[in-house]
Amino acid sequence: MKYIAYAFELTHRPDELTLETAYDLLSAELAEIGFESFEQNETCLRAYIPVSTDIASDIPALLEQFPLPGLLWQYSSEIQPDINWNEQWEKNFFRPIRIEDKCLVRAPFHPTDPDIPLELIISPQMAFGTGHHETTSLMMSYLLDMDLRGLRVLDMGCGTGILAILARKLGASSVTAIDIDDWCIRNTGENAALNDIRDIDVRIGDASLLADCPMFDLIIANINRNILLDDMSAYRSRLGNGGTLLLSGFYTEDIPILTECAEILGLTLSETRSRNNWAALRFTPDSPKR
């Protein structure tokens, strides 16, 4: 598949904002409009999108409406030949990721680490859903701190399948993984096989599929603010009494609107975690009234 590579350079930013944080935020915004992979260096952020889905006309508006003020961008683009994602990962994401020294996320070409009790092997495809991004690592930290043994788990917007795979490795009795992108469905299956997991129920679709799903003890959704707001009622309808809803994929300034939506649906915010302006929330259902 041929890609268009965009190079985004930040020409002005507030002193208190690091270049890495600005590029992370831009990566998240670009991912929402179809960009599939990203590389950061000291001079620019390179973002890749398939030629068939290039949306060049949307980029100026995205930069003008960027969620942080005071930033000025310039960018260029060029058509790339077929990309070797293994080579890209070896050049740009060559170090495995440790999550709280409890879990190692590595590509197949990384060595194992006997000092880490749990490892996940993720095939090199893109930077999101590998543990490198804050939202993924925040959600993983929640899962690693929970007792998932025997739980029925739903992963909405599964991406690479990393959270679904982790849940199964942590003892979940069943895991359902849903995504609207057929690439994600294939990659989740591939990554599950790399981790010797064969029983994740992987489905293509959106929250409308939940009408035919059973109840779940834990629902994970690492997507974006707008989809979470639109679909939270569907999540709530499938969340059993005493269950847990974990949400991420948004900024800390989005916490109030998401919390308000959850409270209307009978959910209570029980914990907040954040890193570099990204947030992850834990909700539990309100106790039934007697």
Swiss-Prot record:
Its EC number(s): 2.1.1.-
The residues the record assigns to binding S-adenosyl-L-methionine are 136, 157, 179, 222
Leader sequence range is: none
A single cellular component GO annotation: cytoplasm
Reactions catalysed, as given in the entry: L-lysyl-[protein] + 3 S-adenosyl-L-methionine = N(6),N(6),N(6)-trimethyl-L-lysyl-[protein] + 3 S-adenosyl-L-homocysteine + 3 H(+)
The main location class comes to cytoplasm
| First-tier enzyme category under EC | transferase
Q: Which UniProt keywords apply?
A: Cytoplasm, Methyltransferase, S-adenosyl-L-methionine, Transferase
Q: Where in the cell is it found?
A: Cytoplasm
List this protein's GO terms for biological process: methylation
> A single GO molecular function, which one?
protein-lysine N-methyltransferase activity
Record carries keyword Ribonucleoprotein: no
Gene3D superfamilies listed in its UniProt record: Vaccinia Virus protein VP39 (3.40.50.150)
Q: Which domain of life is it from?
A: Bacteria
Q: Which InterPro entries does the entry mention?
A: Ribosomal_L11_MeTrfase_PrmA, Ribosomal_PrmA_MeTrfase, SAM-dependent_MTases_sf
Q: What HAMAP family would the database entry show?
A: Methyltr_PrmA
What is the role of the protein in this entry? Methylates ribosomal protein L11.
Q: Which family does it belong to?
A: Belongs to the methyltransferase superfamily. PrmA family.
**PANTHER family per the UniProt record, alphabetical:** ELECTRON TRANSFER FLAVOPROTEIN BETA SUBUNIT LYSINE METHYLTRANSFERASE
Q: What is this protein called?
A: Ribosomal protein L11 methyltransferase
Q: What is the lineage of its organism?
A: Bacteria, Pseudomonadati, Bacteroidota, Bacteroidia, Bacteroidales
Encoding gene (name)? prmA
